[in-house]
């Protein structure tokens, strides 16, 4: 019987360590679940991408160019994780949805970066989840889940165990859609999740938290889809 596919958008913070320890932990986690799942990972750009984008923006680069810089960094991060996984991983990051679809047919762990300018890696991950028929989409971020307000600005912010897709869409509509500015999710991702009814969680990018989510234990914030 074919393994179920799970798409994990992995925050760029996983790739910023100096000694590679965190990266190896993620590689061990992905290798460990690959007996029962086929993981497809989308690497974020993280701090390095934001720094490069800020530098290029100060030099007058347009938004499309800034997006392309972010995509380039995310694909380098993907290559780092591929190196850590070795023979368990597809040997290079797919550059298009069609390439992703062909890559998963090989049965290995597939690691991608960004694909298209104007689209966050969250949107990319949702499109990939749709394309490969993923049973689950885990959006692993720098926070524990979705809060009722910005936890970085409000110490009394409350994390939500569940949030309706419509409510999250309203929250995101207030955010800027500029290169390097996406955090929890983007509107493209929500549209894809809704139309294909993809089971989705937003949670912290932490190996132990991801293990809980894969086992079916409550972790982070569950995205509640509207009735069909």
Swiss-Prot record:
The protein's name in its UniProt record: Uridylate kinase
EC id: 2.7.4.22
A Pfam family reported for this protein in Swiss-Prot or TrEMBL: AA_kinase
Keyword match Transcription: no
Keywords per UniProt: ATP-binding, Cytoplasm, Kinase, Nucleotide-binding, Pyrimidine biosynthesis, Transferase
InterPro entries, per the entry: AceGlu_kinase-like_sf (IPR036393), Asp/Glu/Uridylate_kinase (IPR001048), Uridylate_kinase (IPR011817), Uridylate_kinase_arch/spir (IPR011818)
Swiss-Prot/TrEMBL catalytic activity: UMP + ATP = UDP + ADP
């Amino acid at each position: 019987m074919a393994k179920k596919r799970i798409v994990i958008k992995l925050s760029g913070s996983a790739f910023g360590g100096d000694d590679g320890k965190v990266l190896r932990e993620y590689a061990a986690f992905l290798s460990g679940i690959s007996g029962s799942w086929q993981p497809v990972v989308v690497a974020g750009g993280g701090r390095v991408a934001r720094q490069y984008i800020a530098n290029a923006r100060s030099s007058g680069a347009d938004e499309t160019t800034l997006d392309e810089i972010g995509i380039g960094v995310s694909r380098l991060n993907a290559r780092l994780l591929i190196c850590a996984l070795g023979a368990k991983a597809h040997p290079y990051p797919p550059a298009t949805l069609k390439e992703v679809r062909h890559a998963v047919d090989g049965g290995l762990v597939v690691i991608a970066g960004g694909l298209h300018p104007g689209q966050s890696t969250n949107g990319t991950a949702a499109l990939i989840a749709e394309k490969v028929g993923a049973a689950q989409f885990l959006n692993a971020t720098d926070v524990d889940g979705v809060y009722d307000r910005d936890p970085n600005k409000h110490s009394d912010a409350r994390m939500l165990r569940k949030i309706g897709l419509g409510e999250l869409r309203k929250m995101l509509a207030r955010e800027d859609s500029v290169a390097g500015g996406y955090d929890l999710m983007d509107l493209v991702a929500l549209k894809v999740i809704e139309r294909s009814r993809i089971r989705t969680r937003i949670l912290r990018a932490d190996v132990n938290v991801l293990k809980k989510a894969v086992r079916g234990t409550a972790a982070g914030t569950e995205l509640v889809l509207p009735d069909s």
